[in-house]
Every structure is written in C-alpha cells, then in structure tokens.
Amino acid sequence: MTRVINLDGESLTIEDVIAIARQGVACHIDDSAIEAVNASRKIVDDIVSEKRVVYGVTTGFGSLCNVSISPEDTVQLQENLIRTHASGFGDPLPEDAVRAIMLIRINSLVKGYSGIRLSTIEKLLELLNKGVHPYIPEKGSLGASGDLAPLAHMVLPMLGLGKAYYKGELLSGQEALDKAGIDKISLAAKEGLALINGTTVLTAVGALATYDAIQLLKLSDLAGALSLEVHNGITSPFEENLHTIRPQSGQLATARNIRNLLEGSQNTTVATQSRVQDPYTLRCMPQIHGASKDSIAYVKSKVDIEINSVTDNPIICKDGHVISGGNFHGEPMAQPFDFLGIAISEIGNVSERRVERLVNSQLSKLPSFLVKYPGLNSGFMITQYACASLASENKVLAHPASVDSIPSCENQEDFVSMGTTAARKAFEILKNSRRIVATEIMAACQALDLKPENHELGKGTKVAYDLFRKEVNFIEHDKHIEIYDELNKASAVIEDPSFLEAVEQAVELSIQF
C-alpha cells in the first residue's frame, strides 16, 4: 500500500519531512483541518466586504502599512506582492530543500490561522505531489519578515509565472504546470501574504541539516571507533562508571556507542605503566562528540516545534480577531541553527585531527601517509591537507549569523534574524564535516589493512569495515589510482542511509542517553 502522510498542522515530524522531501512520499490535507481553514477564509472575506483596515489585506506592506487599498484592488495587491518580492539571488536550492519548503508551508497553512482558501493550499499540495518544484534562489532572505523573497519564488509557478523543475527539466512556470496537468490559479485577498510571510525556508533547510547532523553524529562515533582500532586504543575512558558521575546525556550516549561498536574487538587495550592514557581526540570522544549531540538534540526540539507552527502575519484568530504580530521573525530558529553549525564544525574539527594521527607515522607507527614505499608514493598526504582546509573553512562559517542585523523597509523592519543564512551555513558545515568523517573512515580502513597483525574488529566496526571495503579500494600505491575517485566513493558510502542502517542492525547507536 502506498504511504501517504496526513498534514494536520500539529503532528509533522522531522522524519516525515525527510520522507516527503527525499523519498517522494505523498501527503494529504487531513480532514480535521478543513473546517478551520474555511472558517479563517470567511473572516478574510468579511474583512474585505466590510472595508475593515487589516494589514496586508486592505493595506500595503512593510512601511507602506498605512496605505489603504480599495476592495477592488485587493486581488491585484496580492499578485503585485509576489511579482516584486521574488527578488532572490544565487543558485537554486536543491530539490529536497524545495520540497521541504512546500511541505512545511502547507502544514502551517492548514492550521487555519492564515485566511487562505483551501483550494489555494490544495494547489500548492498538487505541485508538491506531482513533482513540480519551483526554482527558488538560495539567497535573498533576512529571516524577517519571514523568508519573503524565496517564498515568492515558490508561489510564482502557481500563477503560471517564474520557473520550475519538472522531471529534472527546468521550464517556465506555465510549461511545468502544463506538462504536469495542473491549472494555474489567481490569488484572492491576503493569499499572497499568507503564502510568503513565514520562517518556512530557514526552517526547511535547517530541518534537513538537523536530520543529517544526527546521522553524522553516529557516523563520527563509528569513525572514532575505527581510529581506536588502529591505535589499539585504551577502552577505560568509555566505561559507564566514568560517565554516570558526569551524566551529560550526549556524553553518556557517545560512550555507550563506542562500547557497542568495539564490543569483541581484539585491537583495543587497557592502560599500562608504559601507556597510561590516549590523546584527547581519542580519549575525550564522549565529552567532545557528546557536547555536539546535546546541542543538536536541542536544535531538533526547536525544529519539531517550528514545523508545526504558524509563522504568518497577521493572524486570523478563531473568534474573528485579527492580530498583527511578529511570528514571522526568525530569531527563535536563527540562534539554534547557529548552534547547529558550531556543533557540526566541532565534529569535523576533531575528525580531521584523528586523520592527522592516522597519516602521521610517528603517531600511528604505520608507513607515512598510509602507503607502502612512502617517498615514491605520497598516499594520503594531501588528503589530510584537504580535510584541514575543510575544517578551517568551517571555523569561518561557524561565526554566528544571528549576531548580525541590518535595518530594512524604511526602518520599519529594523531588527532581522539572518536565520536563513544561519541555516544555509549550517548545511555547508554539515557537507564539509561529512567529507572529513568519510575520509577518517577511509584512512582508518587503510590503516587497518597496513597493520602487520589483523586482529578481530569490534561488533560494529567489523560490519562497517566490510561494507566500506565493498565500495572503496585499498590503495596499494599511487601509480594506478586517482585518490579523488576513492574519496568520492567514501563520501557516497556514508551518505547512503543503508550503510548506517546496516551498522545499527548490528549494534545500537543513539545521540541521547
């Protein structure tokens, strides 16, 4: 039976977002939402017919809020809004981000506080389910008043305007609708504002980054465990007794993950008089990785709220009362997404240091740069440089966007969140850190193959090693390989959900205790 996710404005999960955005799962407006949507729309119709002054319905926008709009111009006002606010720059957002944007906007609208017609919401839903993906430039949002520019680009194809992708082809908005068998619409009063005024873009991009960060945290524990196998790591720093007396949830979870991954390993060791303790990047994984786990768990809790929230303005209350407020302001998510970037950056940073330990013959006691006949061969020399470059780039990207603001709209919108920048930066940091972690796994597997004695790996590390080696080759020497290809294979392996799923079938991994 084909899976369909019902949207009621209350119960959307981050896993649902992934299913619809990346796996093409269909969605449907839950029957429970229809009455509230219709009631909200009737209130807007009454406002127009009674010529009441309500922001964005019978007035202009932003600093033009005191300009009255006649009832006969309220429809043109909404189309003008979309045409002029679609002012984004840069490359288009990827398909999964666009689908997440469409989904989260629909889920917000079905709560029934935006005064939009049910048929208009259903039109956006039809585009989503039929795979018409608006061309949305990635830059141009201040994160307050919501994500106006990118969301206006989302709306254009609904009107037969702008550009959209359909079956991988970039078309005019009208042509995309025609090929998908979708009729264009005209907007009614308030509908343009209802579609574009909200934190939807920053929330969608940040939600994808948060989900991927959760997977990366588990992969980073796996990478660290493989490095411990190479270095014959001391296991006492991961004993439960050590962490229960400092019961930070992420720390406890990391220590347990490492224990589970290394269960049965014949490579790990205990402290001796000649070797009392390992360096921080190995010994302090629970504390370092755990701190990032706690930060990302907090971010996820904020995402869970935001994807089920109304971020429109004005709000049409159930009793007919209209409130002009600030739910569109992105600050509640801008700060968490800055935390997200910092947390992921630390994971990339510590992983790069472990890559250095693997390729450094003085630290690993293996051939320099993990290749036979170093000198004639350079092996992983520049691979470590590349990881260092990414880690250093992350340190620049991790500077918070939310500490900045710039006044706009004739100083009416005088403090903005820059939350969309925070979310986009977090995703860039995620991609960089994922590359570094993939390289650590690749280097650790190479190092294990170079060790003079092949001892049994742990319960989880063995599964990971075997799967990884099916796709990524051992590098014998430089002559017949292009290491770039192997690095890309390594990244592809860990980005494939089936890799981590297979490891988790063997051992339990979590980010919270």
UniProtKB/Swiss-Prot annotation:
Protein keywords: Cytoplasm, Histidine metabolism, Lyase
Chain positions found as 2,3-didehydroalanine (Ser): S145
Pfam families linked: Lyase_aromatic (PF00221)
BP term (GO), one: L-histidine catabolic process to glutamate and formate
Record keyword DNA-binding present: no
HAMAP family with a match to the protein in the record: His_ammonia_lyase (MF_00229)
Post-translational modification as stated in the protein's UniProt record: Contains an active site 4-methylidene-imidazol-5-one (MIO), which is formed autocatalytically by cyclization and dehydration of residues Ala-Ser-Gly.
EC numbers for this chain: 4.3.1.3
Cross-link 5-imidazolinone (Ala-Gly), where in sequence: A144-G146
Gene Ontology MF, one: histidine ammonia-lyase activity
Compartments, record wording: Cytoplasm
Keyword Cytoplasm belongs to the record: yes
Family classification: Belongs to the PAL/histidase family.
Gene Ontology cellular-component terms listed: cytoplasm
Protein's name according to its UniProt entry: Histidine ammonia-lyase
Enzyme class (EC, first level): lyase
Catalyses which reaction(s): L-histidine = trans-urocanate + NH4(+)
PROSITE patterns, alphabetized: PAL_HISTIDASE
InterPro entries cross-referenced by the UniProt entry: Aromatic_Lyase (IPR001106), Fumarase/histidase_N (IPR024083), HutH (IPR005921), L-Aspartase-like (IPR008948), Phe/His_NH3-lyase_AS (IPR022313)
Source domain of life: Bacteria
Pathway: Amino-acid degradation; L-histidine degradation into L-glutamate; N-formimidoyl-L-glutamate from L-histidine: step 1/3
